[in-house]
């Protein structure tokens, strides 16, 4: 991976939450967006009012849960990712 995140941005690879073997095929617009993913890259954090950097609480490799409509989808090296602010992450697996 040759992609570096800036500020408090987090790069996430979405994880599918289970495949249905249903014969009914929904269009992409009707499918629920993933809300679980694996952290691929994190930025260094943001600066507070004193000029000190606030470190990130999320680490590469962690599995996280995030808001359904959070972030922006990007494509890098023929793979799709989601870039979001750390504050859009609501939990991580312990």
From Swiss-Prot:
<dbReference type="GO" id="GO:0051085">
    <property type="term" value="P:chaperone cofactor-dependent protein refolding"/>
</dbReference>
<dbReference type="GO" id="GO:0044183">
    <property type="term" value="F:protein folding chaperone"/>
</dbReference>
<keyword id="KW-0143">Chaperone</keyword>
<protein>
    <recommendedName>
        <fullName>Co-chaperonin GroES</fullName>
    </recommendedName>
</protein>
<comment type="subunit">
    <text>Heptamer of 7 subunits arranged in a ring. Interacts with the chaperonin GroEL.</text>
</comment>
<dbReference type="GO" id="GO:0005524">
    <property type="term" value="F:ATP binding"/>
</dbReference>
<dbReference type="GO" id="GO:0046872">
    <property type="term" value="F:metal ion binding"/>
</dbReference>
<dbReference type="GO" id="GO:0051082">
    <property type="term" value="F:unfolded protein binding"/>
</dbReference>
<dbReference type="InterPro" id="IPR020818">
    <property type="entry name" value="Chaperonin_GroES"/>
</dbReference>
<dbReference type="GO" id="GO:0005737">
    <property type="term" value="C:cytoplasm"/>
</dbReference>
<comment type="function">
    <text>Together with the chaperonin GroEL, plays an essential role in assisting protein folding. The GroEL-GroES system forms a nano-cage that allows encapsulation of the non-native substrate proteins and provides a physical environment optimized to promote and accelerate protein folding. GroES binds to the apical surface of the GroEL ring, thereby capping the opening of the GroEL channel.</text>
</comment>
<keyword id="KW-0963">Cytoplasm</keyword>
<dbReference type="Pfam" id="PF00166">
    <property type="entry name" value="Cpn10"/>
</dbReference>
<comment type="similarity">
    <text>Belongs to the GroES chaperonin family.</text>
</comment>
<dbReference type="GO" id="GO:0051087">
    <property type="term" value="F:protein-folding chaperone binding"/>
</dbReference>
<dbReference type="InterPro" id="IPR037124">
    <property type="entry name" value="Chaperonin_GroES_sf"/>
</dbReference>
<dbReference type="InterPro" id="IPR011032">
    <property type="entry name" value="GroES-like_sf"/>
</dbReference>
